[in-house]
Amino acid sequence: MRSLPSSFTRKLRRQVAANDRVSQLIPDPVNAELHVDSVSYQWPNGHHSLNRCSLTISKPGLWMLVGSNGSGKSTLFRLVTGLLQPQVGSIYCQRSSALVFQNPDHQLLLPSCGSDLMLGIRPNQSMDQRRKKVEALLNQLGLHGLAKRPIHTLSGGQKQRLAIAGALASDARLLLLDEPTALLDPQGQRTVLNTVRELCHDPVKPITAFWITHRLDELSQADGAAQMSMGRIGPWTSGPELGQRLQFGRFSK
């Protein structure tokens, strides 16, 4: 996904990330976390990015989508969050959603970890409630004690975990992660992947993560995986099975 200006990112985090999409789209057609029903989208230049695309995520978990550049993955994410509107078809989200960008520097806007997380918390909470929520999020993402830490001193993996915490600060329970480990070293990749998987399998309050990847080795951690091609998504299958079918490696950029 292309980078976005900081002013637009701020608006996205405050308004779109915690947006309840149900009233904007359709009544619940299925008991699903996310349901995309025959959605099509054509760009002004005539390119058909999505072509009667359908998918259903039926329960919380880590769900991965693979596909070459131009297959429609990022367009789908923009439609789910409401940055774009379907031209044909419909989308239903049971949970409020938030985007996590490939490059956390495009998402982290303020100097310190704590102040950046404050930006995403609903303003109707007291300052004491907001501070406690910041500490809880930092602890949850393995960033304990870093509320006053300058963001520019963090590693790439720490920045990405802070970006995920920022998405959760808005009370989003559906995370849309657009190649979140693409810029990370192997250790950072493993840490971010394991952190998201733990969030998805939390015994009390699990989240749903919809994760775009070019790294097929990551599929082994998925609860389900699918391939996107020419604006359509294939059936869900197990991550290892899809990885074997695609012979492991990386899609061409």
Feature map (PLM): residue ranges:
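Catalytic Walker B motif of ABC-type/P-loop ATPase nucleotide-binding domains
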Residues: L175-E179
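Hydrophobic anchor residue at the start of the ABC signature
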Residues: I164
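Helix-to-loop junction immediately C-terminal to a conserved catalytic motif
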Residues: T81
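Conserved beta-strand-loop-alpha-helix hinge in the C-terminal portion
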Residues: R232-K253
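Conserved ABC ATPase signature
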Residues: P150-L154, Q158
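The feature captures the beta-strand-to-loop junction immediately N-terminal to the Walker
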Residues: V66-S68
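Conserved ABC ATPase "signature" region
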Residues: D128-L146
